[in-house]
Amino acid sequence: MSLYVQKFGGSSVANAEKMLHAAHIIKDTYEADNDVIVVLSAQGDTTDRLLSASREICEEPSLRELDALLSTGEQASVSLCAMALHTLGVPAVSLCAWQVPILTDGEHGGAEISAVGRERVEHELHERRVVLIAGFQGVNENGDVTTLGRGGSDLSAVALSAAFHADRCQIYTDVAGIYTTDPRICPKARRLERISYDDMLLLSQKGAQVLHDKSVALARRCGVMLEVRSCEEGSGGSFVDARGSGDALTGVTKKFCERSVLVGVTAVGQSLPSVEAERACIEALERQDITVYGVEEGEAYLTVFVHRDNADEALCTVHDVLFESRAAS
């Protein structure tokens, strides 16, 4: 019997139909004679709506009370998913982080996980129940709810995978894995079957939205292999591990610069930086009448800065010229 940790993001459980679809995925995993721990985010834009509601009451709410409020979105998700599983005949129990417990430091709004309790979850698994755990949250030494910041549910899933030595850590998103760039913007993006922790960490730090950089860093530190999948796809997906694919070029992403009209378009790969790649990018952008305002180089990456109005076009241009030149070489 294998242990699966499955995390579903907010867009994957945004409404009743999607929640039931996620429940069917969980059911299939459970009925294949596996133990299953599920981590859920708040549905859709629930967190944003809760945050907006708090601002209507108080411009600068207490961080403690804000954490208590925001954590209710995930609590609702796990309860609803447990109900969905019950209707499918699957025994399931929902837990908030304090019931596990997932212990954190005292930092509200961006807490760090310090330990994960095992006894309660192991008992539920022994009773052959699916254990649904609210993501994005923990509890500090005072018994107060804390939240883990952006990407917190990914962090919850990785921490639980490490604590329980899970055989699989599956991250379900609205895309069918990790791509060489955003497939919703660039038609020539292709899915990566495998990527290294180091390359994924760089892509996340430079703007890729699939996985938060803190969760990738924790997975690397704990040796947790990640599997990124889509709820809508029956196969495929991408693995993130220490080995990676060995490809010299991995992906291209973008990140808007704070307090600036510029956006950084970054290519990541072990062949970077290089004079040839920099020249190819600049020349391709110039052919599209896109001005390059600067270049930044670092270990395994190359960034060109363009005006944010050209962000999507520049992303596709840099992606296509680098991957086409690699294919031709």
Task: Indicate where each model-derived feature is located.
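Conserved beta-strand segments of alpha/beta enzyme cores
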Residues: 91-93, 225, 291
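Nucleotide/pyrophosphate-binding catalytic subdomain
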Residues: 1-216, 303-310, 328-329
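A conserved active-site cap/scaffold subdomain adjacent to cofactor or substrate pockets
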Residues: 201-241
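A conserved regulatory-domain signal marking ACT and ACT-like small-molecule sensing domains
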Residues: 238-329
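Short hydrophobic alpha-helical runs that function as membrane-insertion/retention elements
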Residues: 168-172, 226-228, 294
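Short gly/pro-enriched beta-turn/loop segments at secondary-structure junctions
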Residues: 164, 221-224, 257-261
